[in-house]
């Protein structure tokens, strides 16, 4: 992430002598702020876009590398590895700073069946649906990543775009339904979905992969503890997974630049300290 938390973390890590790369899909929430006048050091209001531009420029000056890529997954084998569209990035430490997770659409039945057929991680849960029919809710690269994880395991995958246009090239064996999802069916477990127009599809699982993978979605993929849309961290910004840190809006609390910068500084410092210890 290249918002206040991500750039702050990168600044502290690179100045501590750590090779530091920022993976960013592009401007985030800060870029949309028209005027900021409560941030330290500015005599006049500054736009979010300008503050972001200056921060990135400073990070580049200090040696931070920037890669434009959309993170779609996070795994751990010999190293933590961030999966992006087209390439994987192994790292000794990862700091999640991609902002607050997007709200899940208020589709009746969706929230109530989480863990009982509704999932947010194909890599985690595909095994439980082997030989069954499932649906993926989404339309972009993140949804494609989940589809690709499911296809070798399940019997069939149906894509539910919920009215959004397709933003990725999906395999031909995936059936696409563009209609709005009206309700997720099932009393104790998912039994299907109902779309606008009265269409009902029998499925055993619904995998939510809307928009881009937020910090919380990535944390879930590797087993880090989350609390709702918030990643659980300690005072060092360390998650429950060794080597994985989180900072900024994704940890909850005050959604302000100053708080994000502090947490990024803490995460970058602690990650660098841990790497020096080996």
Residue ranges and their predicted role:
Residues 1-22, 96, 100-106, 193, ...:
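N-terminal-biased segments
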Residues 2-53, 58, 132-133, 138, ...:
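Beta1-alpha1 glycine-rich phosphate/pyrophosphate-binding loop at the start
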Residues 21-23, 67, 95, 119, ...:
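Hydrophobic/aromatic beta-strand patches that form the interior of the parallel beta-sheet core
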Residues 30, 53-77, 81-83, 88-91, ...:
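A Rossmann-like FAD-binding core segment of flavoenzymes
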Residues 32-33, 106-111, 127-129, 166-173:
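Short loop/helix-cap segments at secondary-structure boundaries that form the rim of catalytic
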Residues 62-131, 137-139:
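Glycine/small-residue-rich loop that forms an oxyanion/phosphate-binding "nest" at active or ligand-binding sites
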Residues 101, 106, 112-128, 210-259, ...:
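FAD-site-proximal beta/loop scaffold in flavoenzymes
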């Amino acid at each position: 992430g290249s918002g206040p938390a991500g750039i702050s973390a990168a600044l502290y890590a690179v100045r501590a002598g750590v090779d530091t790369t920022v993976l960013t899909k592009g401007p985030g929430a800060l870029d949309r702020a028209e005027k900021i006048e409560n941030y330290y050091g500015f005599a006049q209001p500054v736009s979010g876009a300008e503050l972001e531009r200056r921060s990135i420029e400073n990070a580049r000056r200090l040696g931070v590398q920037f890669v434009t890529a959309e993170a779609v997954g996070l795994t751990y084998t010999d190293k933590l590895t961030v999966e992006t569209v087209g390439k994987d990035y192994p790292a000794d430490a990862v700091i999640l700073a991609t902002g607050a997770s997007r709200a899940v659409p208020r589709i009746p039945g969706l929230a109530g069946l989480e863990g009982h057929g509704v999932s947010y991680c194909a890599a985690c849960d595909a095994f439980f649906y082997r030989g069954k029919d499932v649906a993926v809710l989404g339309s972009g690269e993140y949804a494609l990543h989940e589809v690709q994880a499911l296809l070798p395991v399940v019997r069939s995958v149906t894509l539910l775009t919920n009215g959004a246009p397709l933003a990725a090239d999906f395999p031909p064996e995936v059936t696409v339904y563009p209609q709005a999802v009206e309700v997720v069916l099932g009393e104790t477990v998912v039994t299907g979905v109902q779309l606008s127009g009265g269409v009902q599809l029998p499925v055993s699982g619904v995998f939510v992969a809307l928009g881009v993978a937020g910090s919380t979605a990535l944390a879930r993929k590797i087993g880090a503890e989350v609390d709702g849309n918030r990643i659980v961290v300690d005072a060092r910004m360390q998650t429950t997974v060794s080597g994985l840190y989180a900072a900024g809006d994704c940890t909850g609390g005050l959604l302000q630049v100053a708080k994000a910068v502090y947490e990024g500084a803490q995460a970058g410092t602690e990650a660098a300290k841990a790497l020096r210890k080996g």
